[in-house]
Structure formats: structure tokens, C-alpha cells
């Protein structure tokens, strides 16, 4: 005999309640998760006065530089050793930073660009249990930072060579020092279903680099050397989509 309509209505309602009462899929021991998303790097930057080390050592009075923000594609791989403890390897396409002259160098405009490589390994503690749909976390790790494709603008090259080359512009190159730095990380993961999740995190990296600029004339002879220190101290946000396997 067919069930009355009111019985079917109750069955449907109970099914909906049961579906929403199921434990939310989340991360647990042994899980591996790949996240792909957007890194935004906001630099809390500053710089020391540009110093001339040769010839006639001395400061370039009133000089400074600033480093702009950057965006890039981010990739992270996370392995859960327990339901709460995980290690994450953060990678990504190296972001390109733009440097602008400040103070007495402001008239030069953009003075250079560089790509930053900063793979990181972060230990994370996830709060809640493996059935939690929303899981905040804290993390602490380390990153190795180095730079490539360092390019100086023609205006800066002229500024650091022409005064020592009879007013004729030469060429200049720059080396940026590599370093290790700690990574402080907080964030949260929202589990959409058994496999997919959304992630958002903020990391702070206390970071600086020494810049050494070498000027040469047309014959390749070194005619000037300058140096400065740039503080970057970036805050890095990461908005991503994760897949568990």
C-alpha cells in the first residue's frame, strides 16, 4: 500500500537532517593535501643609505629605496603525521619585485627588479578533530631565500658610473645576498567535502638582504662600488584550493 504523502515528507525531512548531521570530512593521519592558489606578498620595507665603498668611500646623502608588493602562483604540499600535526612544503613561481628610488634617488624612478626564491618548510598544528569542517592552525617554519634575474635600470646604472667615468654612463650589476629566515604562520582550512577544501593563511617572514652594486666602464674595468641593506619583512597571504589524496 503506498505510503501517505505526510509520511514521505517526514522521511525526506529526516534524510536532509541526517545528511547535515554526518561528520564533516577533514584531514587525518596519513592524508596528503595539495593546495594551489594565490600568494600576495606585502612588504613592510625600509632601506639604509646607499654607501659608496670605492672610489672615495662615503654615503650617497639622503638616498633610499622602496620595494613594491608582489603576486604569484603558490603551491603547497601537506602531509598529516597525526590528526593534528602536519608538515607543509610551500613552493611557487618566484615573484618579481620592483625597486623604486627614494629621497635623493626619487628622480630615478624604478631602479631595479629581482625575482625572489623562498621555498619554505612549516610545521603546523591544526585545532579541532578530524571531523571538524573548519580547522584553524598555527605554524612555525623556515625558508631559504635567494634572488635571480637581478636587473638595474639604466637611470641607476648611469647614476653609479657616470660620476667616475668622465660623465659617460657605464654598466652596473647588483648581487643580493641569500639568507635563512623564520616563518610565522596562522590560517584556517574549510573542508568542502571529502576531498576538496578552501584554505587561507597569513605568514610573516623577518627578512633583509645586502645589495652590492658594481659599476664598470666600456672596457669592463671596475670604476665604482656601492652597497646598501634592504629590509623586506614580507607578510604573505595565501588563498588556495586544496585536494586530499
Predicted regions and their residues:
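Short loop/turn motifs that connect adjacent beta-strands in outer-membrane beta-barrel proteins
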Residues: 25-31, 84, 128-135, 192-195
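Cleavable N-terminal export/targeting peptides
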Residues: 1-30
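Predominantly the C-terminal beta-signal and adjacent terminal strand-loop region
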Residues: 96, 193-245
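Gram-negative (and chloroplast) outer-membrane scaffold detector with strong preference
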Residues: 40-42, 76-157, 232-245
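Solvent-exposed loop segments that connect transmembrane elements
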Residues: 47-63, 99-108, 150-173, 210-229
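Short glycine/proline- and aromatic-enriched beta-strand/turn motifs that initiate or cap beta-hairpins
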Residues: 26-76, 236, 242-244
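Transmembrane beta-barrel strand/turn architecture of Gram-negative outer membrane proteins
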Residues: 120-122, 183-190
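Short sequence motifs at beta-strands and strand-loop junctions characteristic
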Residues: 65-71, 113-118, 174-181, 229-233
